[in-house]
């Protein structure tokens, strides 16, 4: 197909995520390393890691080899009543990566199709555990605002009910309990203590589990908070006999500069969701990890959830290799370097009118504006600098592949700063037109 034919069919017929039909989309013909090649010949740095998944860049040779070798043997087989080596190898790796000095923290793994599905399954686990341990009245969940956990119905029910993207579903979704958004990184000890006291007031007898994104809230606002707060929530869950469900789909596998933002800070969730970078961005897969205690308490012990492509051997083989790469540890130096380079490269954004905050953690960089940004203007400004980003709400942000060079990260920084300037200019124009 020609680029024009692709665009014509796309515009006329294809729905894209979080977009109305007919929205403009750039045709991509090839990816390699940190780059996207467009149909018109332009090359862009993928500063989003294709929605935070391609941590090792596109087309990593070890992942390509794993995919080729597996597809020649077995691309798919049902997971009901059958098993296979890729699933066993991946499970072994996940249990090892999430283990501590005293041994494994987890003993059970559910392989899901996507991050949203993993949260859905984790919620089922928590509710089944409550019933199985004699607490059927525990049928609600507690979370904090500004969170995002996915687009399926149970996952949507624990996303921010007002400021999130699922507010249209109020009255249809299960009603959960919401604490205020957590105090941001750098909050005082007194602020954290006051927040945790308020959080505890919501831990009524009907709460089965607390659901949080630890340290970084992703698509709900790219907000950072301190690990001490997560430790405080863990203590409250233990005190009240409530399960802690941690969504590390975005943060897991090194994105923040830590392997996992819970475990690396001394917090062991009862249920842990991981995904995105689990396959290095090759294909969709996620996992839910839990303990023997939770598994034994569930009634019935079977989880009534069975996706057609659960445990897909092709996805598992690639994920096993991707988690081998993570286990080798190069991501530690890579994310330390990216954090340094992004901090320097994004600093000029602080001088732009309308910038509310600039923050960096590991391989995450955020420029937050004081107003909702014009997505078209900001995206185009970055593309003009040879970089692909996807702003949302007030946030212009980047989660680059770990394999980016210093020059590439600095180019990303210049593009994000240019996007912030474009957002400020577009906002000013809108204000002047409204006068």
Where are the regions a protein language model picked out?
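Conserved N-terminal phosphate-binding loop of PLP-dependent enzymes in the Aspartate aminotransferase
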Residues: 1-435
């Amino acid at each position: 197909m020609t680029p024009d034919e692709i665009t014509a069919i796309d515009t006329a017929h294809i729905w894209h995520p979080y977009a109305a039909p007919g929205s403009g989309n750039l045709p991509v013909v090839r990816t390699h390393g940190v780059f996207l090649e467009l149909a018109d010949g332009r090359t862009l740095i993928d500063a989003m890691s294709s929605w935070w998944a391609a941590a090792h860049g596109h087309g990593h040779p070890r992942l390509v080899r794993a995919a080729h070798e597996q597809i020649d043997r077995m691309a798919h087989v049902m997971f009901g009543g059958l098993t296979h080596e890729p699933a066993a190898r991946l499970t072994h790796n996940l249990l090892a990566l999430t283990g501590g000095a005293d041994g494994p923290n987890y003993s059970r793994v559910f392989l899901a199709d996507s991050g949203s599905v993993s949260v859905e399954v984790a919620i089922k686990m928590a509710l089944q555990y409550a019933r199985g341990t004699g607490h059927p009245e525990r049928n609600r969940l507690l979370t904090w605002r500004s969170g995002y956990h996915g687009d399926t119905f149970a996952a949507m029910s624990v996303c921010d009910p007002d400021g999130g993207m699922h507010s249209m579903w109020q009255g249809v979704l299960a009603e959960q309990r919401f604490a205020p958004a957590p105090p941001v990184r750098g909050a005082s000890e007194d602020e954290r203590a006051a927040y945790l006291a308020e959080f505890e007031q919501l831990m009524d007898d009907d709460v089965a589990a607390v659901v949080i994104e630890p340290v970084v809230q992703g698509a709900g606002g790219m907000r950072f908070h301190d690990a001490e707060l997560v430790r405080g929530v863990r203590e409250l869950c233990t005190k009240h006999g409530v399960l802690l469900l941690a969504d590390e789909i975005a943060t897991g596998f090194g994105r923040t500069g830590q392997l996992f933002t819970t475990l690396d800070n001394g917090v062991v969730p009862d249920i842990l969701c991981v995904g995105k970078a689990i396959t290095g961005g090759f294909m969709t897969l996620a996992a839910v990890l839990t303990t023997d205690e939770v598994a034994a308490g569930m009634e019935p012990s079977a989880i009534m959830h069975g996706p057609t492509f659960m445990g897909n051997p092709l996805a598992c083989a690639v994920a096993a290799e991707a988690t081998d790469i993570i286990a080798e540890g190069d991501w530690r130096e890579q994310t330390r370097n990216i954090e340094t380079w992004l901090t320097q490269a994004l600093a000029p954004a602080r001088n732009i009118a309308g910038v509310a905050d600039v923050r960096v953690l590991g391989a995450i960089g955020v420029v937050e504006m004081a107003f909702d940004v014009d997505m078209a203007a900001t995206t185009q400004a970055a593309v003009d600098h040879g970089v692909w980003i996807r702003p949302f709400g007030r946030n212009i942000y980047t989660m680059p592949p770990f394999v980016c060079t210093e020059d590439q990260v600095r180019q990303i920084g210049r593009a994000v700063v240019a996007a912030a300037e474009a957002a400020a200019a577009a906002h000013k124009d809108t204000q002047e037109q409204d006068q």
